[in-house]
């Protein structure tokens, strides 16, 4: 048996040439459509990567803000400074430098409350009052006792005092 020679017949030659041209054209069509779809996918992935990057930046910004707010809240919940005010110094004719010296002396006595949290200072406010009131202060070689009139506990501890002669 012999296989017929198709390459000599022009009908078969056109058929095979058409198949080859069709295969080449369909291959180019496949490459074009595949490339188009891949280009769309790549652009979609790039958009998603950019969106994820933006979201990560937002997350980091929010985390930084949250961290700063937490630090501020921690700082706000601590006693940061002490303020002492003498209310009736004029009644005893105490000069301004002596008033300032007295206020500084009281500040030194209660300065350990700085950097303590407000809640613990509030719980020990009676002890703080007694610490101030039980001490005898010397101003111009005269002995004075202090009475706490007002004690404000916040980020700044404010103490308003009245003095009287010690007995």
From Swiss-Prot:
Induction: Expression requires the sigma-E factor SigE. Its main location: membrane. It is a single-pass membrane protein. It is found in: Cell membrane. GO terms for cellular component: plasma membrane. The chain crosses the membrane at residues 15-35. Signal peptide: none annotated. The keyword Cell membrane applies. Keywords: Cell membrane, Membrane, Transmembrane, Transmembrane helix. Involved in sporulation. This is Sporulation membrane protein YtrI.
